[in-house]
């Protein structure tokens, strides 16, 4: 999936920013969170997050749900490299395994299970 953030900023600028963030906040993970293009779920007001490394994927999903004001009965799916991560996984583990070459972790979300693959842990 194409990232709007990657389209808006050059690789060098993204890499420099992620390095600056990691130096200033070594216990935080730089995350870019964007909606899947054709999803009918609400767009998020903020794409860039500094996530505590001990946060779980499930806790991060809760943050996203709050930001887009998603009602409890509605489903949300998040994807990393087009795969559904386990909700109990730590964001630090996901970051180490799936961070982009620019130093950011790219997460997409959707109201439906667009890709349908679960992490092979």
UniProtKB/Swiss-Prot annotation:
Organism whose genome encodes this protein: Schizosaccharomyces pombe (strain 972 / ATCC 24843) (Fission yeast)
Protein family according to the UniProt entry: Belongs to the ATG8 family.
Topology of this chain in the membrane: Lipid-anchor; Peripheral membrane protein
Propeptide stretches in the record: 117-121
PTM per Swiss-Prot/TrEMBL: The C-terminal 5 residues are removed to expose Gly-116 at the C-terminus. The C-terminal Gly is then amidated with phosphatidylethanolamine by an activating system similar to that for ubiquitin.
Descriptive protein name: Autophagy-related protein 8
Role according to the record: Ubiquitin-like modifier involved in autophagosome formation. With atg4, mediates the delivery of the autophagosomes to the vacuole via the microtubule cytoskeleton. Required for selective autophagic degradation of the nucleus (nucleophagy) as well as for mitophagy which contributes to regulate mitochondrial quantity and quality by eliminating the mitochondria to a basal level to fulfill cellular energy requirements and preventing excess ROS production. Participates also in membrane fusion events that take place in the early secretory pathway.
GO cellular-component term (any): cytosol
Name of encoding gene: atg8
UniProt keyword annotation of ATP-binding present: no
Main localisation: membrane
Residues making up the signal peptide according to the UniProt record: none
